[in-house]
Regions:
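N-terminal targeting/export leaders
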Residues: 1-111
Length: 111
């Protein structure tokens, strides 16, 4: 484990709802992100895992979280380029691939 970050709600309470662990060698290819959360509601859609850039504008989807835990490959150089904010969002089944704006929890990797 290279880094671990708590995933907390975005409201004022900042309740810890899960963790994200960066696996693999720091700065190397082949890193993975392991997500482990409490059960949560996806509403009528699904939960998607994102890496958001520190500029708050750019982001990349890592995939869909089915259940409460999963491991996702991290794109090469994503962390070095500032994609260190882990975000879980509720998404709808629609034809829009971008982030819905409905974040459930978030944490920033200390890398």
């Amino acid at each position: 484990v290279v880094a671990t970050v708590p995933l907390t709600t975005l409201d004022a309470s900042k309740q810890k709802e899960g963790t994200a662990e960066l696996l693999g060698n720091q700065g190397s290819q082949g890193q993975e992100l392991r997500i482990d959360t409490r059960p949560m509601s996806s509403g009528s859609g699904y939960v998607e895992v994102w890496l958001i850039n520190t500029d708050g504008k750019r982001m990349v989807s890592l995939g869909v979280l089915s259940g409460t835990e999963a491991t996702f490959p991290v794109p090469p150089d994503a962390l070095a380029q500032g994609y260190t904010i882990v975000d879980l969002s509720r998404e709808q089944y629609d034809d829009r691939p971008q982030h819905s704006g409905d974040s459930i929890m978030r944490g920033t990797l200390p890398v």
